[in-house]
Amino acid sequence: MTTQFSVADIELSLSRYPANQVSNLQAWDAADEHLIKHLKEIEQKADNTAVINDSFGALCAALTAQAADWPIWVETDAKTSQLGTLQNFNANRLSDSNLTWLNSRELPPQGINLVLMKLPKNLNYFIHQLQRLSQSLAPNTPVYIGAKAKSINKALLETIAKHLGPASASLAWKKTRVITCIADGKPRALPSEVSWAVKEFNLSISNLSNVFAANKLDIGARIMLDNLPEGHFDTIVDLGCGNGILGLRAKQCYPNAEVHFVDDSEMAITSARQNWQANKLDNPEQAKPQGHFHWDDCLTHLGDEVKPDLVLCNPPFHQGEAITDHIAWQMFLDAFHQLRPGGMLQVVGNRHLGYHVKLKRIFKNCETAASNGKFVILRAIKSAKEPVKPAKDVNEPDHQS
């Protein structure tokens, strides 16, 4: 897949993150190109700009390539988006000193005069973003939203008008359109968080808008919760934790354990932390907090001092619009590296994904702990005889696009 981004006299080399694992998937799409092309056509000058949902920094890099001091506030929920943007700035020898990072719960500052945005897959998340923009944008601020033409319809334009201001769509170009919204300056109230009960485990769960399974247990989590391993565990990692349901239940089952919640989504980590606190899962007999929360790319920055004896994992197989198994590969490899000898990785996944093959390549063992018609639970044990890191040629994901 090409890494050469070329549009409107801007030439960049862009890779997804991590670059060495997703070489057959492109770091941008035609909607990114359309947004930059549109700015060139209207002769947009450098101004205080919010860039939202920029997957791997294509928009930020294109603006910075035009003007090194272009002031950009970058809003992302994904840690890999932040890391990918910085990776691409470095690869193109661009300074990132013009970038100010915001998470998806923070309001952009007053004085933003331009917004560039990619349409996310999650409509509830998109509405949340529009409502937050309505609280900070001055009247008549232009908001340009890039999306696939097939994703844009009358209902979407009405949704944008309802939550931010009147909107219209451009002509199609490379099967994409640019929506122009003019902020009306009327602040909208943010919706309340979704809360629901898992009565059989006496847990109360709340989700922020970009967290998977907004108001009920997903099927994979359900079978995982019913099949947690027997035994005693001191340090547990809920890898790809979402709202934290697996780690919360693990703390109930292993009350003396410390639990580390890890996710690429900042909203997921915030939801997991809120759920830990709401369910009062810290053991009062232990002197220090037992819940730890990490917004991270898998276990990249967890630290060698954390050596879990159990990792629970419900891997995603999407990254944005792309279907890919590289995230599962990285999760399995990171778990292998992080686990103490004799530690267990327990994974739930769709049968057709073939995770047992990957786990056997990495751990040299894998057993089926439970299954139903659609899902399978797999367990792999890190042998004391295995090296701390597997050979590099193990890391050979089979990509799809």
Curated annotation (Swiss-Prot):
Q: Which GO terms describe its molecular function?
A: 23S rRNA (guanine(1835)-N(2))-methyltransferase activity; nucleic acid binding
Give the main EC class. transferase
Reaction(s) this enzyme catalyzes, per UniProt: guanosine(1835) in 23S rRNA + S-adenosyl-L-methionine = N(2)-methylguanosine(1835) in 23S rRNA + S-adenosyl-L-homocysteine + H(+)
Q: What is its EC number?
A: 2.1.1.174
Q: Which UniProt keywords apply?
A: Cytoplasm, Methyltransferase, rRNA processing, S-adenosyl-L-methionine, Transferase
Where does the protein end up? Answer: Cytoplasm
Pfam families linked: MTS (PF05175)
Q: Does the keyword Cell cycle apply?
A: no
Reported function: Specifically methylates the guanine in position 1835 (m2G1835) of 23S rRNA.
Identify this protein by name.
Answer: Ribosomal RNA large subunit methyltransferase G
